[in-house]
Swiss-Prot record:
It comes from the Bacteria. Pfam families: HEPN (PF05168). This is UPF0332 protein glr0978. Belongs to the UPF0332 family. InterPro entries: HEPN_dom, UPF0332_toxin.
């Protein structure tokens, strides 16, 4: 693992830890955002293994889907989870007065981001 990949994985771990703490404090919108970022950092680190990167979130998600999930290098369902996590992050960060993430959203995303991180770590260890 390169130093840049390690830094991204460290950021992912910190984001996941923050997501858990925030969920425990019933701050579900912010928890969802941190879970998304845990997944996003893992996606970026994984793409670097193929010498790929993007300057945008949508570009990173697209490259991840094309070169890692659809190519069979990583499970396809984690790409779908990353897409769904971004949608929830946007809802939590920018949603209106009646648009908030639920406790269930936060709990599901924490579990998914922990699994995403484990899969990314195994991929990067190859």
């Amino acid at each position: 693992m390169t130093p840049e990949q390690q830094d991204l994985m460290d950021r992912a771990e910190q984001s996941l830890q923050a997501a858990r703490i925030l969920a425990d404090e019933a701050l579900f919108d912010v928890s969802v955002s941190r879970s998304y970022y845990a997944m996003f950092y893992c996606a970026r680190a994984s793409l670097l293994a193929l010498n790929l990167s993007s300057k945008s979130h949508s570009g990173t998600i697209s490259l991840f889907g094309q070169h890692l999930a659809a190519a069979g290098r990583l499970p396809i369902e984690i790409h779908r989870q990353l897409i769904d996590a971004e949608r929830l992050r946007i809802l939590g960060d920018y949603g209106g007065a009646n648009s908030h993430c639920s406790q269930q959203d936060a709990q599901v995303l924490i579990a998914q981001s922990a699994r995403f991180m484990q899969i990314a770590m195994e991929f990067l260890a190859q």
